[in-house]
Amino acid sequence: MRILVFLSTVVLAWFLTGAVASAGPVLEGDTDDPVSPAPAVSRPDSPHCSVTLAERFPSNAADGSPQTFSGTLTPPESCPGPWAKVVLDETVTVSGRQYDRIGDLLIGGTEVWWGTTAEPSGEGRRAITYHFDKDLTPYTALLRTPQPFTGGIGNYTSDVYTGVYAQTVTLTYYRADHAHPAPATADRVVGFRHADAAPGAATVHFTAKDLPRNIIRARLEVTLEGGACDEQWFDDVPDEVAARYPAANLCGHGPFREAAVALDGAPAGGVPTFPHIYSGGIVPTLWRPVVAIDTFSLHAETLDLTPFAGRLVDGGPHDLAFTVPDIGGSWSVVATLLLDTDHHAARTSGALTQDDAAPVAAKRTKVKDIAGGVNATVTAHRDDVTAGYVDTSAGRVRTRVERTRDYRNSDDVTVAGLTQHVVQSDAGWQSSVSTVDGKARSAVRHDWSYPLAVDASAANYVDDQNFRLTGAVDMTMRLSDLSGDGRSWWPVSASREWLGTSGVLARENGVTSESDGSSRTTYAGTDDRGRPYWHAITTDHGLVTAESGGSRRR
């Protein structure tokens, strides 16, 4: 349901008038600060130092124009490496009326954080403050030397949208010691500024150059964020359905999305994305105070490119291409290469021996009539295999990567296109097995599942002064990591984060008549140390009404 088409006008009108107290349906006032059930990044009990990149830095200058913070990040003298962990912390405060916005942090040309904001309620009586953190230890190689940085929230203000985001950003370096050893991390981090794909230009390219000549392992970390008609890509409909209901302004091209990756023109696999929903999405009251899963720091996927390592060590530039088939809006692509090198040889060599990765996923679409409308069902599948070898100081290392994805989206479109019921399943796994002389050297597997159900209705929409928008979302992120011997697997970590939420926003004759939401959310599994962790939160009318488990609210 392209509810956002209505909301661009609706929310503006709602904010201009504000909520008016009355008997009957609930009108939310000030809401609690945004919260999440997910565990915070763990912190070693070792000496540490913090570096401040921004201190209550406003997203906008005095004249209202967007601005970014910048400088040079230098490792603190009192906490030289090696480090057990490096953690990014960001605290954001905003009040007034504002849309959800996108933020990022570039260090040495690498996007180390990409996320979105909480949208303030618009009441203007109390600011909201939220905090998030991210483990930057995987980028340790980048952080060892002084690097330029720039970042911030891209925000735009007006006489109506007055909210300015105040940002405090720090990096904390935890020194390694006997009790907290430095973990193994990539020897080289090769990042790129993000690039945007769009209809008519569905492929973006990054050039990787000056790579090490002794690579033994290569991983590609990818974050994808949809915009415009693909902001809620999971409720995009096939073109024939959009054409059937032109007045509903439905977005077409169907709901399946991926970034098909190619290295120097050779297919390397497909990258999915979690169905992120931003804090103004569908109905804004859905996300107060519990925001959608991973709103503040978008989840990245990792594609193992080790079978291609023999090609990457030739000393020349290499093209990384990302294509978004059936693109209906814009897609921001954030890519980072994490490279391991041979510590006992200046040069390695190798070859790609098998490339059975499909250029695009196999997809099927079926549309049928149902009572009051149509059902559109889209399925897609990937079953990719790549393999190669690298000649190293430890011998010839052969690596086989298998990657699967099974996708299904069923969308009941009724009431002339103004109501949608979406049920989506999206799951897959990647395994990487490396052997020397037939014996397993390493074997890892990552499983993921992102089920989603969305009900959205603008059936009672008359105009921007008379409407009732309703929405309900049930979303889950299931992740698990396993290790093995090439034949059997055993669990290392697992988690399940779930959120069920419902919301409503209504106006009658230009006056807000209903503004309410409620939600339940849980996190169950392990934290980043592998320890059991459970946290549950219940909310109603924009306020936390119950909370159990966990170590702290954030």
Residue ranges and their predicted role:
Residues 1-23:
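Secretory targeting and sorting signals
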Residues 78-87, 211-219:
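Extended extracellular/luminal ectodomain segments enriched in beta-structured repeat modules
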Residues 150-218, 340, 344-393:
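Flexible, low-complexity coil/linker segments
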Residues 24-58, 62-79, 83, 91-185, ...:
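Beta-strand-rich ligand-recognition modules
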Residues 211-233:
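Short, compositionally biased leader-like segments
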